[in-house]
Amino acid sequence: MNFKQNIVYKKMAISMKITAIRPIALVISFTLLSCKDKVKTVEQQDEPTKPNIVYILTDQWRGAALGYAGDPNVKTPHLDALAKEAVNFTNAVSVTPVCTPHRASLLTGKYPITTGMFLNDLYLPSEELCMAEIFKAEGYNTAYWGKWHLDGHRRSAYTPKERRQGFDYWKALECSHDYNKMPYYDNDNPEVKYWGKYSPFAIVEDANTYLEKQAKDDTPFLAVVSIATPHFPHGSAPQKYKDMYSPESLILNPNVSPKFEARSREELQGYYAHATATDEAIGLLLKQMDALGLNENTIVVFSSDHGEMMGANDVRPFQKQVAWDESIRVPFLIKYPGIDKQKGVTVNAPINTPDILPSLLGLSNIKIPDGIEGEDLSELIKNPDPEADREALVMNVAPFAGGYPNLPYRAIRTKQYTYARTTEGPSMFFDNVADPYQQNNLLGKPEFETLQNELDAKLNKKLAELGDEFKSRDYYLKKYNYVFGKNKPAIPYWEFNNGKGEVQSPIPVTQ
């Protein structure tokens, strides 16, 4: 029997995208009415309660830039408290560390090389089966707030309902980082509105109203709260929070280049200020969930789409795309119903962006549709093992904008090692336990040759499983018919306002 065939997710031209098969608890002849009633009773007894999901997605928040992760500067008391109640993946990575590719992979459970979503400002094909559509088919109410960055029709343009990939309640915008006057669209109203305060607090305030309404309803819900901080511009953080961080007093990591030290201190003041303000806003969201009694049956996730280099390893502030940990490693806390003894446990095995959707489906007892490429890690989440290990595949298919001078790469991250290869050969080999700031590249050292070969073989295996031929940037641009703009090596977008989006001019970056 086809999975939810009668549900139409989009317009008829792209309807019935789900083709995976889901077993029905019991099928019985409708002529046997008494038996039918009996089966209903069994279904009601055996059907597990569907958990709600609140997914908190931030932007450019480095995995190490939290109090619970050991950052000596930043103040994040509410997320520190959540970490004590959740499973903490210490080596969560972004499959392609930049906004649009991560978000597309998160919603589809697929790799950027498969969907073609490996650049910013691309159009996620409507035919792709996405997170909200799957949960909606299971009877979920779906809601989305904040930054979207998947429609590919100008960053300030209205996103019509058929382009929201299954999200019904909608207060979002394609892309803006004007935090003190952030525009958004209210559901099906095509007239732009503006959040009335610093956007993390405004978005959470509206989300809390939604949660209050949902708490009175038995319908399970999927709520994605997409907060665009602490992505630059950092100077726009509220002064109250900037006053908490004197640039001169900040402790810099030892891998920050001297030439970027002054700039990094200046930017970190605003970066940490955004982080602390966002932590406070998230605290209000978590407090509301507790007050409404939603904690007992809600999966809560806190994560980010990518990190940011902030002067580390000779890469200027604002830059990502590269394979160093400051760029690829992101926070990932997950709290789920019945967590009990697993509270505060850490998992050192990596979780990758495509793994998130199938893992949420696994935790929700929902059949994983065919075509999803990520791995269901729900058993590891429910039975966390700090000693477990696996390889996460990270890729930059076509470096663009500020990263344009770099070569494309493929890399694997394990709980201990990072190994990367560009189109010209091996480029990175770090022992992240012995060398947490990745300052000692082990490539070519005789004593590590065997290990390097093993990691190279594992990378080749991951590429083969995915069918990734690992070709040049131009090959993939031509394959997907992508054309960079004349003035910037990136997908053109319009109505670029000061303080919105990515850096405006490419600056050479060494990898």
From Swiss-Prot:
Top class in the EC scheme: hydrolase
Lipidation (S-diacylglycerol cysteine): C35
Sites where the protein binds Ca(2+): D59, C99, D305
GO molecular function: arylsulfatase activity; metal ion binding
Active site: residue positions: C99, H149
Modified residues (3-oxoalanine (Cys)): C99
Keywords: Calcium, Cell membrane, Hydrolase, Lipoprotein, Membrane, Metal-binding, Palmitate, Signal
Pfam families the record matches: Sulfatase
Cofactor note: Binds 1 Ca(2+) ion per subunit.
Its membrane topology: Lipid-anchor
UniProt modification remark: The conversion to 3-oxoalanine (also known as C-formylglycine, FGly), of a serine or cysteine residue in prokaryotes and of a cysteine residue in eukaryotes, is critical for catalytic activity. This post-translational modification is severely defective in multiple sulfatase deficiency (MSD).
InterPro entries: Alkaline_phosphatase_core_sf (IPR017850), Sulfatase (IPR050738), Sulfatase_N (IPR000917)
Location(s), subcellular: Cell membrane
Description of what induces expression: By ulvan.
Principal place of residence: membrane
Signal peptide: 1-34
Enzyme Commission code(s) on record: 3.1.6.-
Gene Ontology annotations for the cellular component aspect, listed alphabetically: plasma membrane
Cofactor: Ca(2+)
Lipidation (N-palmitoyl cysteine): C35
Family of the protein in this entry: Belongs to the sulfatase family.
Family matches, as PANTHER family: ARYLSULFATASE FAMILY MEMBER, ENDO-4-O-SULFATASE
Role played: Sulfatase involved in ulvan degradation. Ulvan is the main polysaccharide component of the Ulvales (green seaweed) cell wall. It is composed of disaccharide building blocks comprising 3-sulfated rhamnose (Rha3S) linked to D-glucuronic acid (GlcA), L-iduronic acid (IduA), or D-xylose (Xyl).
Protein name per Swiss-Prot or TrEMBL: Ulvan-active sulfatase
Organism listed in the record: Formosa agariphila (strain DSM 15362 / KCTC 12365 / LMG 23005 / KMM 3901 / M-2Alg 35-1)
